[in-house]
Amino acid sequence: MSNGSIPVDEVIEHLRNWNFTWNIILTILLVVLQYGHYKYSVFLYGVKMAILWILWPLVLALSLFDAWASFQVNWVFFAFSILMACITLMLWIMYFVNSIRLWRRTHSWWSFNPETDALLTTSVMGRQVCIPVLGAPTGVTLTLLSGTLFVEGYKVATGVQVSQLPNFVTVAKATTTIVYGRVGRSVNASSGTGWAFYVRSKHGDYSAVSNPSAVLTDSEKVLHLV
């Protein structure tokens, strides 16, 4: 056209393509967020974690770019961009500090899961089991079904005997470790079926790495970030 304007049909076509692209992106994002749980799909969970980890540096880079673009042009935008960059950087640093502190207690890479700040740990058949939880619960239940052990609904081991159920479990947070002692159980040794219930007994600066005994040894009591 002579006046240099963009034809309406071309604008509609670009909007249609743009809308279709965003429809695909948002649908994929919706599926990842809804079903990106470790119990449902390890692959979707990995994609979800990658998205969460990428968001911090991406938002920080966008905030710094906005600050550079707004410098001496729009001081209000510049101030807000600097503020958002500082908030993002602070959240990023806090995430790494708390994750490292949690890792020192559990020695598990679940410590770097950005979805939670608490890990339930116990020892089963000499193997350390670590499960992310949303918070420190009032009580913890271990369920044994025909020799298959479930911890808070997670399948963690098979071929487990009733006598191998631990005497305590721990829930580690960045600032403390909560020890749960066994207060009751109902088991059928012949079928390898039953349950054990644990409640809070104490908390402190303990290592969350546990053993099947009822007493925390001196080697399990370690100081962390102070």
Swiss-Prot record:
TM annotation in the entry: 12-32, 42-62, 76-96
Domain of life: Viruses
Keyword Transcription annotated: no
Region of interest called Interaction with N protein, as start-end residue ranges on this chain: 200-216
InterPro entries in alphabetical order: ALPHA_CORONA_M, M_CoV
Self-association state and partner proteins as the record states: Homomultimer. Interacts with envelope E protein in the budding compartment of the host cell, which is located between endoplasmic reticulum and the Golgi complex. Forms a complex with HE and S proteins. Interacts with nucleocapsid N protein. This interaction probably participates in RNA packaging into the virus.
Protein name: Membrane protein
